[in-house]
Amino acid sequence: MKKISIHDLMKWKQDGRKFATVTAYDASFAQLFEQQDMPVLLVGDSLGMVLQGKSDTLPVTTEEIAYHTRCVRAGSPNSLLMADMPFMSYATPEQACQNAAKLMQAGANMVKIEGGEWIAETIKLLAERAVPVCAHLGLTPQSVNIFGGFRIQGRDETKANQMVKDALTLEKAGAQIILLECVPASLAERITKACTVPVIGIGAGNVTDGQILVMHDMFGISANYMPKFSKNFLAETGDMRTAVTKYIKDVELGVFPAAEHTFN
């Protein structure tokens, strides 16, 4: 696989070519994903739940994300690698710069930050300092205590309109990717059409430019339950490599996510 850059993703959006993304946490799986031509990987703070067994992502530290980023980069030298900025690691602009630097030095090509238009100045600051940013909207797991659980976001008109505004504000501030989690497909379509940067969805229908799944969900090995928006590709194929290829192709063809994986 050739080295993937944000410019490739921008070109794919312009060409209407959909792309797949998955979380990764170690060199072995990162290598497997790269061998199957997975273009984008995310070292997610989801590791707190799927690796550490925590009930949410809040305990994850920047040092832990940096460690797993180094592991993933070792296994996948050519993917576009995003790394999550954990809870409160970007509470101030100064903290954001210091912690983003650690993740970029660990091998990330981009950091992912949760938050609406209030985070625009931080994104602008990072972009000006050569740190590409993916802005995460919708269900932002670090806000689980505000939301009262993992709930669908943007179902009423006021919140939907605010999310569109957030996406455009963050793109203007310098975000190079927008990630939408657990939002109605109609809202995801509005945002995907409104933004010039690539939009990645998880639980956001099949109209976004890209899709992302947690690795453990894609292989059906999550400890607790299978989210509505996920699919066990390993059960369908019986082989991990074939499962990865099937996921990539289904995303590219717009077959996944299907109606049963989508919120209205």
Swiss-Prot record:
Keywords: Cytoplasm, Magnesium, Metal-binding, Pantothenate biosynthesis, Transferase
UniProt similarity note: Belongs to the PanB family.
CDD domains: KPHMT-like
Note on cofactor: Binds 1 Mg(2+) ion per subunit.
Pathway listed: Cofactor biosynthesis; (R)-pantothenate biosynthesis; (R)-pantoate from 3-methyl-2-oxobutanoate: step 1/2
Compartment(s) where it occurs, according to its Swiss-Prot or TrEMBL record: Cytoplasm
Domain of life the protein comes from: Bacteria
Catalysed conversion reaction: 3-methyl-2-oxobutanoate + (6R)-5,10-methylene-5,6,7,8-tetrahydrofolate + H2O = 2-dehydropantoate + (6S)-5,6,7,8-tetrahydrofolate
A GO cellular component annotation in the UniProt record: cytoplasm
Keyword Transferase in record: yes
Main location (coarse class): cytoplasm
Name the UniProt record assigns to this protein: 3-methyl-2-oxobutanoate hydroxymethyltransferase
Any GO MF annotation of the entry: magnesium ion binding
Binding-site residues for 3-methyl-2-oxobutanoate, renumbered to this chain: D45, S46, D84, K112
Gene3D superfamilies according to UniProt: Phosphoenolpyruvate-binding domains
GO biological process: pantothenate biosynthetic process
Family annotation (InterPro entries): Pantoate_hydroxy_MeTrfase, Pyrv/PenolPyrv_kinase-like_dom, Pyrv_kinase-like_dom_sf
Residues forming the catalytic site: E181 (proton acceptor)
Cofactor: Mg(2+)
Source organism per UniProt: Aliivibrio salmonicida (strain LFI1238) (Vibrio salmonicida (strain LFI1238))
